[in-house]
């Protein structure tokens, strides 16, 4: 069994409200990524991967273009990355990534999700030491030796490579993301990445055996998902 990462294939939202939420989260992340790293996907690999993910989630082109245009224009909202962590229901370990223009509001909203589920938000580092901050690149392939060689030739610090069900999964420290992706594309040409993300990966995962705690954990995730500022939630729970 491979490393536990979240393969967030954004499913088609069933309602207009759900679609609007998905579009808004992608729009905000595209804007911030383009503003910080440049609006050209060819030179901003994080933006390139994000746009591909947005397209797979069926985000309309006009939503993507509007976010890029806003980043080109300068000014606009001043979003900052905010990260919170703590112990959720069932003694789960949770990391919450946000993009916010009002950190005080966002902290209050996230803390409320903990409070309403009778859990407590933690201090920075309280659970993140039990996660790896890693880049994950997954694509169709069989020859993991060739992939490893290409990465090592480019002096990429490789954490792990898996070959399972006709797919190769590459794990590298998040700081090696651009170098690893460039090395793979240089070696093998255009690649359709099934997963192209930076995530927090738990060192170990566990089930929540108590049904009441499991239901409360799922409610906790739903509450976080309803917050506009929350972009990603990482946890050590097997659902």
From Swiss-Prot:
Stretch forming the signal peptide: none
An example Gene Ontology molecular-function term: DNA binding
GO terms classed as biological process: regulation of DNA-templated transcription
Keyword annotations from UniProtKB, A to Z: Cytoplasm, DNA-binding, Transcription, Transcription regulation
Keyword Transferase set for record: no
Predominant localisation class: cytoplasm
UniProt xrefs under Gene3D superfamilies: 1.10.10.200, 3.30.70.980
Locations listed in the record: Cytoplasm
An example Gene Ontology CC term for this record: cytosol
InterPro entries: Integrase-like_N, TACO1_YebC-like_2nd/3rd_dom, TACO1_YebC_N, Transcrip_reg_TACO1-like, Transcrip_reg_TACO1-like_dom3, YebC-like
Pfam families: TACO1_YebC_N (PF20772), Transcrip_reg (PF01709)
Family: Belongs to the TACO1 family.
Descriptive protein name: Probable transcriptional regulatory protein Tcr_1104
Lineage of source species: Bacteria, Pseudomonadati, Pseudomonadota, Gammaproteobacteria, Thiotrichales
């Amino acid at each position: 069994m491979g490393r536990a990462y979240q393969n967030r294939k954004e499913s088609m939202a069933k309602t207009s409200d759900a679609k609007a939420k998905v579009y808004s989260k992608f729009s905000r992340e595209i804007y911030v990524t383009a503003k910080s790293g440049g609006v050209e996907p060819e030179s901003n690999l994080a933006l390139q991967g994000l746009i591909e993910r947005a397209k797979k989630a069926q985000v309309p082109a006009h939503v993507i273009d509007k976010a890029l245009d806003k980043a080109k224009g300068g000014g606009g909202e001043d979003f900052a990355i905010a990260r919170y962590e703590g112990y959720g229901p069932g003694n789960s370990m949770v990391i919450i990534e946000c993009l916010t223009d009002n950190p005080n509001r966002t902290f209050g909203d996230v803390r409320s999700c903990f409070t309403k589920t009778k859990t407590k938000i933690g201090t920075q580092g309280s659970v993140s030491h039990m996660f790896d901050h890693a880049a994950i690149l997954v694509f169709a392939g069989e020859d993991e030796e060739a992939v490893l060689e290409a990465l090592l030739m480019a002096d990429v610090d490789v954490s792990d490579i898996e070959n399972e069900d006709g797919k190769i999964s590459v794990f590298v420290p998040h700081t090696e993301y651009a170098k690893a992706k460039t090395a793979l594309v240089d070696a093998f040409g255009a690649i359709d990445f099934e997963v192209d993300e930076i995530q927090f990966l738990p060192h170990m995962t566990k089930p929540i055996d108590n049904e009441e705690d499991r239901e409360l954990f799922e409610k906790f995730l739903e509450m976080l998902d309803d917050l506009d500022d929350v972009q990603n939630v990482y946890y050590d729970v097997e659902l």
